[in-house]
């Protein structure tokens, strides 16, 4: 698979780049640092979260198109904060992550309803 880039989320050869994660920049996460990525349905509260966190656990990058999306990918790292992304093609990002050895599961996530 040749990679992925929708302008907000990009999968490179060795990391995922989450643009507009911080007010003035991107967050780069090496694939080896990811414990798991969970694909979850995005409820009303998640759809309305354009940027930031409502529970101090899930952190959403800036995505003004999020209200029209139905699926989020929650990235589990070693720390308490879980980055949450809503790529334009979540299935393709999940496949790209799996191709790089990241465990990808599906389920539910409290705090995103």
PLM feature spans:
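Short, charged, intrinsically disordered terminal tails
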Residues: 99-113
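Non-transmembrane, membrane-adjacent beta-strand/coil modules in membrane-associated proteins
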Residues: 2-7, 20-29, 33-80, 110-113
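A membrane-cytosol interface segment of integral membrane proteins
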Residues: 67-103
């Amino acid at each position: 698979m040749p990679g992925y880039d929708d302008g907000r989320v990009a999968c490179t050869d060795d990391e995922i780049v989450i643009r507009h994660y911080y007010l003035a920049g991107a967050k780069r996460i090496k694939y080896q640092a990811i414990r798991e990525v969970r694909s979850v349905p995005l409820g009303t509260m998640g759809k309305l979260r354009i940027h930031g966190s409502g529970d101090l656990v899930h952190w959403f990058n800036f995505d003004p198109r999020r209200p029209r999306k139905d699926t989020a990918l929650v990235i589990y790292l070693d720390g308490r904060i879980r980055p949450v992304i809503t790529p334009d093609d979540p299935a393709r990002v999940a496949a790209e992550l799996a191709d790089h050895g990241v465990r990808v599961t599906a389920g539910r996530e409290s705090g995103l309803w």
